[in-house]
Amino acid sequence: MTELEKNVREKFRFITKTLIEKKLTITTMESCTSGLVASLLTDTEGASAVLKGAFITYSNEAKIKQNVPAEVIEKFGVYSEETALEMALAAKRAYSADIAVGVTGTMGNVDPSNNDSVPGEVFFAIAHKEGTVSRHITVPVMDSRYEYKLYVAGVIADEITGVM
């Protein structure tokens, strides 16, 4: 296990335990991380008490089917803070969760399906009881797609920790 993976797994262990203690629930709508955030949340025993469900919406069509407004994707692009925010809000509504994460972006190479694709550009948002947070990050070059996903999940973990 790499140091990156070890650190990210520890962050999510802390998050899941804290959510259990605080009796808070969480959900995700993930694109570029392919469900890794939800998966990491469930690696700690008792996660079923906090993870209400999750969506992997890898395509634009999947996002729209889960109530991300097509108009937002058309106006701002699928890779935008606005789309990430709508993903978080749609997931939050779907599961009535206390915290919801939406994440979209391009990892190591250009997405031929979307003109606004820039490798390493990731957008995520967190909707919670007090409001919303959205971020745009540039992911450094990594050796594998898994490492890209881990890196992004780690950044998201830091933001989740800040809103719990």
Label every model-predicted segment.
Residues 1-164:
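Short alpha-helical segments enriched in small residues
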